[in-house]
Amino acid sequence: MEKTICELFAGVGGFRLGFDRLNTGWRTTWFSQWEPGASKQWAHDCYVKHFGECTDLNGELHTGDDISTVNKDAIPSHTLLVGGFPCQDYSVAHTLASSKGIEGKKGVLWWQIRDILIAKNAPFCIFENVDRLLKSPASQRGRDFGIILSCLNDLDYSVEWRVVNAAIYGAAQRRRRTFIFAYKNSTEYGQKMNDEDSTQLITRTGLMARAFPVRDAVKLRTTSLPKDVVETSDSFAFLFDNAGYMHKGVIYTTPVNEIEEEPILLGEILEHGAAESFYITDDKRMAKWIYLKGAKKIQRKSASGHEYTFSEGPIAFPDPWDRPGRTMLTSESTLNRSTHVVTDPGTGKLRTLTPVEAERLQGFDDNWTN
């Protein structure tokens, strides 16, 4: 089997860098990275700087285009489709033209993934999403993940999933993400796993269990997907646990407890000294930081006129050196509650993270995004 990869929503190349570091012969044949509404495609340009461009089967360059406009048949063939896609509204309806066709909401990237799977028939897939995917939407818990499973089931994939806190497995960031591994039932791996006991697959023998070791399952629960994706969208609700497996429309899920590894601590990634612009030197800004990081209760009124109390607990200020970093958001370094504020090891003064520290927190090499 040829070890080829297609990388969607590639960002600055995290998936590709991870496979390259494994040094096991995987080769990326095509990628896609496009940021809607941006005048400059910084992430795409960073990716190309490190890895170069990829042409499609027509010899054309479309890696920086909106994936919804890309000819899926022209994407080079690949063994593994990977990508981190956002948690969006996955609800669907029957198309007007056909009661068997389905139509998702415009702009929802899952449907682009599905179209590529139909066009290219990749034997294996690895996807990443936020941890709340398993519980969304609030009005119909589990529906969105059920739709994804239903789509994959219709295309003859079985699926393993796990919610992973990166810091528990040795990374520098307490970042919880849902990882999804799907494989065609006709593959050698699929035929082998289809004979496995579901609990053993989730906790011992499956890819997720071997990559992210856990202790024994707590309690296995099962349910079945509705007959089609539209019915799943309309009526399916289920409380997914942090680990599970789906085969032929039957879902098996259980809470699992991770076997922890030694994490990288925030203090280990900090530089000694930084440019003056990173330091908090203004008294008014310092007061704002203290307010944002502190506990608070605020009376608010909803659009409908309902009054309620908004409350939130405190965040450590500054962030402690002896723990992994918190989840880093795209708003990192701006004046907001989620931004890391650290005591500089060299100066003893409070400041935000430098670009190099942010790269280290995400597992990239220093100056990767320069």
Residue ranges and their predicted role:
Residues A171-V250:
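Flexible, glycine-/basic-rich loop-and-beta segments that form/coincide
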Residues V82, W161-V163, F179-F181, T327:
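Conserved hydrophobic/aromatic beta-strand scaffold that supports enzyme active sites
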Residues R16-L17, Q88-V92, L133-S136, G170-Q173, ...:
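Short catalytic/ligand-binding loop motif for oxyanion handling, primarily in non-cytosolic enzymes
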Residues H247-N370:
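C-terminal target-recognition/interaction regions appended to catalytic cores
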Residues G64, D131, D156-I168:
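Conserved S-adenosyl-L-methionine
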Residues M1-F124, V130-G146, S150-N153:
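Core alpha/beta nucleotide-donor-binding catalytic domains of modification enzymes
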Residues K120-P123, Y157, R176, N336:
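A short helix->loop->beta-strand "cap" motif at the edges of active sites that frequently abuts
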Residues I148, E160, R174-T178, P324, ...:
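Residues that flank catalytic or metal-binding motifs in active/ligand-binding sites
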